[in-house]
């Protein structure tokens, strides 16, 4: 498994600062945020300008380019995102599910949309991943399984995020066992309680909440998962840089200890 951090944790800072701090925290790689409103890292509207900067920074800091997070399923936006992924060398694009929880028609619309986007991902030679998300059409294990049954493209996979499954009232470790064969990316953070939001950024750091992340990573290891495990902490755009660095380092230390306990490192 490759440990990375999503640049959205450092959403208030420029890319040179982000790469430097993620390297200093000891991560293997980086997930580049293309989340409008949360960061100005990979801006899809001007990706041609961003691409060489990202490639140069990755080489300079020895960080693997693990994934991109671009939440929109808009076909034009995603087409540009896929072109950017190819140019930069990002093998995975993580998008949001969209839609409405508990609405079968909404879920079917999401399945249709993701199926079309998976075809485009195959065209570009990248992998499209989606995760269950609180309040969205895909929000728990049953809805996740419906999507996985409907879309068999090898260019499509699951981005498994234990914090959303936890807030859906499930046990993330058991939920992971049901889908692990289709997992191609992992977003990781901790969470206290089962409310709609994941909590303050510092409360999302691995080990601060209620999720059995050791058990979670053990299941991944036991099933031969070798893909990215990317820390995704949101809400820290206005935080001082030092605080963002501390969150990144704390979470990475917890992940490293978990992998060592599993025998994965």
Predicted regions mapped to residue ranges:
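Alpha-helical scaffolding within the catalytic cores
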Residues: 49-53, 77, 172, 213-216
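Conserved beta-strand positions in the central sheet of alpha/beta enzyme cores
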Residues: 31, 67-69, 94, 129, ...
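Glycine-rich, proline-tolerant flexible connector loops at the mouths of alpha/beta enzymes
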Residues: 31-55, 101
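Histidine-acidic metal/acid-base catalytic patches
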Residues: 1-7, 11-29, 59, 86-89, ...
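Active-site-proximal loop/turn and secondary-structure-junction residues that shape catalytic pockets
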Residues: 9-11, 34-36, 71-73, 97-101, ...
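Metal-dependent catalytic neighborhoods of phosphoester/phosphodiester hydrolases
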Residues: 41-48, 76-81, 241
